[in-house]
A protein has these predicted regions:
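Regulatory/sensor and coupling segments of signal-transduction and defense proteins
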Residues: 2-7, 150-214
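Sensory/regulatory domains in signal-transduction proteins
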Residues: 2-166
Length: 214
């Protein structure tokens, strides 16, 4: 784990650490900041690695904005494209449900992924997803970042074909103060058929708070 400005976290990439710290600062005591509070001039060195997702009326989660480095990683402009289109086919449903959960429950999520190129290269990435609110109070956007764990000479030259999810976990509000020993993976939560997503999220948070109390 790495100590950042808001506490202990499992993030290991400077880009995701910095944007999470920024998001945490501007939200203050709220569960999520207003999208109008996000000032590009405050994080100019991160812009190329940032993205914003939105939910369309048909339920699709799409890129509203994608930084130049992200577009270069995949060899195309991602604006308007479904977020799930970047992922391995068997993971589309889990990825979309996680993005919706970040907005519905105003709770950030952290992914560890492996990206595979069209010629067989692979690289590890860290992805952070954080909720944003509109002026009407609705939590209807996701601010995120995609960053490689280590530099690779072929990145941004040979396009990625898809991402594969290796691990995912929630970053509840208390996470900025104390890091529990283990966070239940999101893909386990969304796969649970016997309980709703909201109930599962509340159960996870309850477990985390109990761990902190001990």
């Amino acid at each position: 784990m790495i100590r950042n400005g808001t506490g202990w976290c499992e993030m290991r990439v400077q880009t995701t650490i910095e944007i999470f710290d920024y998001w945490n600062r501007i939200r203050g005591a709220a569960d999520a900041p207003l999208k109008s509070q996000v000032e590009p001039s405050a994080v100019p060195h991160l812009l190329q690695s940032l993205f914003i997702l939105e939910a369309r009326e048909d339920g699709d989660i799409v890129f509203r904005l994608a930084g130049t480095r992200i577009c270069d990683l995949f060899g195309r402009d991602l604006r308007g494209e479904r977020f799930s289109s970047l992922w391995a086919h068997g993971q589309h449903g889990d990825i979309e449900r996680t993005a919706i959960g970040v907005m519905d429950h105003a709770m950030p999520a952290l992914f560890n992924t492996t990206g595979y190129s069209i010629v067989g290269h692979q690289a590890s990435f860290e992805i952070i997803m954080m909720p944003l609110r509109s002026s009407n109070g609705a939590c209807d956007r996701v601010l995120g970042a995609i960053a490689p764990v280590a530099a690779a000479s072929w990145l941004e030259i040979v396009p990625l074909e898809f991402l594969a999810l290796d691990r995912s976990r929630l970053l509840p509000e208390k996470f900025s103060k104390v890091a529990p020993a283990e966070l239940r993976p999101i893909n386990e939560i969304v796969a649970a058929k016997s309980i709703g997503f909201g109930q599962a999220m509340r159960r996870v948070v309850s477990q985390l708070l109990s761990a902190e109390a001990r």
